[in-house]
């Protein structure tokens, strides 16, 4: 038995050492480098590739061109140097959050030299932020920070527990009996409860606007608008699976019908001003459709 335990221990140590070694591999190549003049430089090492292109929402798209899962992305040819590194530098870009991916001999590929990757339902892309403008609101700045909680509520109507993200402003925990207005913020067809806080940078924007006095401290509730889903892919009891659009029940009205369950959960667990004057709802695309229907059916 001692020999078995020792062998298992040594095997575990070997795995750990292998994993640790990866931390010290030289990472000389950088990509999505935002330069001082707001140009951005991309680098990708693929000496055997015949053609490498970059697909990004900063590139002009040719008529009829569709790049993987990236809506509005155009294709730009990259240039290979003698070391097999493909490179491209953009023109100066406006201040914004941008997404992109590489096309290596026609195959969509994530940039391995940029660890910042977002998932938009079933597709992934690298992202970067060009500052010196409105995108400074998307950054983590030295301001008081709110709290983003991943909560679960039970839906009797949908017969499941469902995940929901709730932002509370800086100082909420120390504010005694103070009550806050609440915004219900709904995502689009390709999103889930995580969309507004990843791609949307909602928590950072709220922190910055509240700190600047441009927004009132508020609670923001971000549920999952796909009625058939417990939670975002990888966060539910289904485990890791390949996401796909338009699950059964997505647009059958169930989310709108049982929306009062979300309001009840929020008002039972958070100090909100629970009246029509201090309650708002907004959404993007499908979320706008949901917002309109919920407002018509529940005008309070």
Question: What function would you assign to each model-found segment?
Answer:
Residues 34-300:
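Non-catalytic cap/lid and distal C-terminal segments of serine-dependent acyl enzymes
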Residues 1-21:
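Bacterial Sec-dependent N-terminal signal peptides
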Residues 20-41:
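N-terminal edge beta-strand
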């Amino acid at each position: 038995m001692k020999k078995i335990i020792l062998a298992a221990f040594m095997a575990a140590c070997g795995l750990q050492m292998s994993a640790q070694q990866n931390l010290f591999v030289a990472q000389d190549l950088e990509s999505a480098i935002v330069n001082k003049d707001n140009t951005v430089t991309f680098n990708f090492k693929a000496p055997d590739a015949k053609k490498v292109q970059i697909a990004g929402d900063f590139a002009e798209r040719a008529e009829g061109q569709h790049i993987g899962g990236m809506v509005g992305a155009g294709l730009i040819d990259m240039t290979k140097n003698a070391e097999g590194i493909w490179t491209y530098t953009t023109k100066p870009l406006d201040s914004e959050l941008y997404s992109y991916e590489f096309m290596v001999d026609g195959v969509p590929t994530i940039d391995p030299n940029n660890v910042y990757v977002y998932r938009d339902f079933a597709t992934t892309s690298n992202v970067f932020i060009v500052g010196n403008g409105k995108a400074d609101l998307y950054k983590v700045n030295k301001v008081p920070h709110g709290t983003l909680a991943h909560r679960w509520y039970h839906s009797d109507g949908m017969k499941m527990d469902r995940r929901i993200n709730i932002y509370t402003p800086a100082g909420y925990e120390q504010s005694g009996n103070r009550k806050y207005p609440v915004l219900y913020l709904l995502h689009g067809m390709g999103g889930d409860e995580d969309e507004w806080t990843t791609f949307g940078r909602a928590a950072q924007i709220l922190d910055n606007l509240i700190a600047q006095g441009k927004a009132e401290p508020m609670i923001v509730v971000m549920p999952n608008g796909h009625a058939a889903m417990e939670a975002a892919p990888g966060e539910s009891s289904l485990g890791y699976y390949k996401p796909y659009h338009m699950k059964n029940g997505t647009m059958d009205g169930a989310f709108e019908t049982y929306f009062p369950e979300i309001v009840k959960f929020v008002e039972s667990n958070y100090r909100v001003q629970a009246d029509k004057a201090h309650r708002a709802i907004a959404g993007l695309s499908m979320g706008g459709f949901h917002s309109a229907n919920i407002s018509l059916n529940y005008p309070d």
